[in-house]
UniProtKB/Swiss-Prot annotation:
Cofactor(s) the record lists: Cu cation; Zn(2+)
SUPFAM superfamilies attached to this UniProt entry: Cu,Zn superoxide dismutase-like
GO function terms (MF aspect): copper ion binding; superoxide dismutase activity
Superkingdom of source: Eukaryota
Gene3D superfamilies: Superoxide dismutase, copper/zinc binding domain (2.60.40.200)
The protein, known as: Superoxide dismutase [Cu-Zn]
UniProt-listed Enzyme Commission number(s): 1.15.1.1
Disulphide bonds in the chain: C56-C145
Lineage: Eukaryota, Viridiplantae, Streptophyta, Embryophyta, Tracheophyta
UniProt cross-references to PROSITE patterns, sorted A to Z: SOD_CU_ZN_1, SOD_CU_ZN_2
């Protein structure tokens, strides 16, 4: 079993911890707890870079090793890092579990060392009509991020 963690930080009082685990070649399980967000849906993605020197903006685009368009987690044509939305309750917190086959913790496509980002707005899952639909899901600004690191 390989485990990883990302501790979210933000200039907007958003905080949280995201845990990743993968057993062999099985899908990766992502479990998160985030607080300080506005209620509703928020885009949630693995980004290409583990660089936060310029805050969440320096994490680069969504992780996309296959060069595909943005989509929903269940779509075949999607960025590997497209994990959809997390749902935030009226109290500003979200607790969630996601299982995904395109974000391994080992091998050449590993997400270790990459960024994970919570966005300000809902991800339209590549199905909206906005000019950013096919690249970012029109999910808005980056309100919190962390770097995915191996956990002992």
């Amino acid at each position: 079993m390989v485990k990883a963690v990302a501790v979210l930080s933000s200039s907007e009082c958003v905080s949280g911890t995201i845990l990743f685990s993968q057993d062999g070649d099985a899908p990766t399980t992502v479990t998160g707890n985030v607080s300080g967000l506005k209620p509703g849906l928020h885009g949630f993605h693995v980004h290409a870079l583990g660089d936060t020197t310029n805050g969440c903006m320096s994490t680069g685009p969504h992780y996309n090793p296959a060069g595909k368009e943005h989509g929903a987690p269940e779509d075949e044509n999607r960025h590997a890092g497209d994990l959809g939305n997390i749902t935030v309750g009226e109290d500003g917190t979200a607790s969630f579990t996601i299982t995904d086959e395109q974000i391994p913790l080992t091998g050449p496509q590993s997400i270790i060392g990459r960024g994970v980002v919570v966005h300000a707005d809902p991800d339209d899952l590549g199905k909206g009509g906005h000019e950013l639909t096919k690249t970012t899901g029109n999910a808005g600004g980056r309100v919190a991020c962390g770097i995915i690191g191996l956990q002992g």
